[in-house]
């Protein structure tokens, strides 16, 4: 997660509250994407953090977190929340596979495949993102909870994602790998 808006940490509400986690405020979106695509459950998380970019600022917390996550099916995921980077705000996403690799960057989706001669062929798909009104999305979720429509599904997914984010926080605080149940 390339945040690229360091001024929001230094001058906005994120730097003024008693605790702000770039993991809970940013990395959580990547965990959501991974879980949505793979449906994987995580069994181990080890995270590292630093405060280099915001070292001499009012912002008191980490500006970069990198987590290595192992799933129950032994897939490995790496999530980086880089809030101090010089990069447009964007959720970069790469899936490496044995038959193809998918890379989602700002302006396109790239598929890397090998042909019969073992040469890599790159297919590029241009993307146009729709902007989503977060207020509408939040109201939809709240209405589902209040009506108990898909309540269990929303709850379990949401709580599992939060559980994984809290394991990242614990790994940083203890400087240890966290084993999940």
Segments from the language model and where they lie:
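Active-site rim elements
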Residues: 20-21, 125-128, 147-155
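NAD(P)-dinucleotide binding in Rossmann-like oxidoreductases
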Residues: 56-62, 72-137, 154
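Predominantly a Rossmann-like dinucleotide-binding segment in NAD(P)-dependent oxidoreductases
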Residues: 1-58, 175
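A structural signal for well-ordered alpha-helical segments within the folded catalytic domains
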Residues: 28-32, 132-139, 156-163
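Secondary-structure boundary/capping signal
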Residues: 41-42, 46, 75, 149-150
């Amino acid at each position: 997660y390339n945040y690229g808006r360091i001024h929001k940490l230094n001058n906005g509400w994120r730097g003024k509250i008693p605790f702000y986690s770039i993991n809970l405020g940013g990395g959580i979106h990547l965990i959501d994407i991974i879980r949505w695509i793979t449906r994987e459950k995580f069994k181990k998380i080890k995270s590292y953090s630093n405060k280099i970019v915001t070292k001499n600022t009012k912002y008191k917390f980490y500006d970069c977190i990198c987590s290595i996550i192992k799933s129950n099916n032994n897939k490995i995921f790496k999530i980086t929340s880089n809030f101090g980077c010089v990069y447009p705000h964007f959720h970069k996403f790469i899936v490496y596979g044995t038959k193809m690799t998918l890379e989602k960057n700002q302006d396109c989706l790239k598929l890397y495949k090998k042909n019969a001669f073992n040469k890599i062929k790159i297919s590029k798909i241009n993307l146009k993102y729709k902007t989503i009104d977060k207020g509408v999305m939040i109201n939809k979720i709240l209405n589902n909870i209040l009506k108990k429509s898909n309540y269990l599904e929303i709850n379990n997914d949401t709580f599992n994602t939060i559980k994984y984010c809290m394991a990242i926080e614990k790994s940083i605080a203890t400087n240890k790998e966290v084993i999940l149940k």
